Amino acid sequence: REDDARDKGLRTSKLQYLPDYLGGKVRIEAGTELDALKAVPAIKTDRLSLTPLRKGDIPAYSALCLDDERNRWWGYDYRTDLGDKPLTENYFLDMAKADFAARRAVNFAVRLKGKLIGEVVLYRPDFRGGFEQGCRIAPEYAGHGYGTEAFAAAADWALYHLGLARVVAKCFKENEP
């Protein structure tokens, strides 16, 4: 077989087989149910509201994301993605917005009387109608059932409004009650 004769892109060796037809390229991208969302919706429960994250949440959201004790159960370390870049004030909010813009995840701010107390995230699509879900509540609000309430509300929305086939949650054994 002959090489490409230094042609960039087109492999001339394909033409050496004397094909009847050279078809055009086709690009296929797998989509998810998040593709139908234009914006992060708002969800209400008896005590909580789940809403999009906003600029005013930066201090509380950053504190939640930087809480190493709480985040060891999260299964993700922001330092891996951050690398050598400096940590900016907007880093976590910008990442959440970028993930939604690319339809990789949807982050809900968990609010109690308007104040951000945690986060629920649908992420890691399996491209078969399922997503993983995670929830974290600020330590000063833990133990009051807010995590359970927020988690259930987001799962209900995902299954019955977004139309997912399944929502999967994982828990580190050490994090069991």
Tell where the protein language model's regions lie, with residue ranges:
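Conserved beta-strand-loop-alpha-helix junction that forms the acyl-donor binding cleft
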Residues: 2-9, 169-177
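Conserved acetyl-CoA-binding loop-helix of GNAT-fold acetyltransferases
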Residues: 1, 137, 143-160, 176
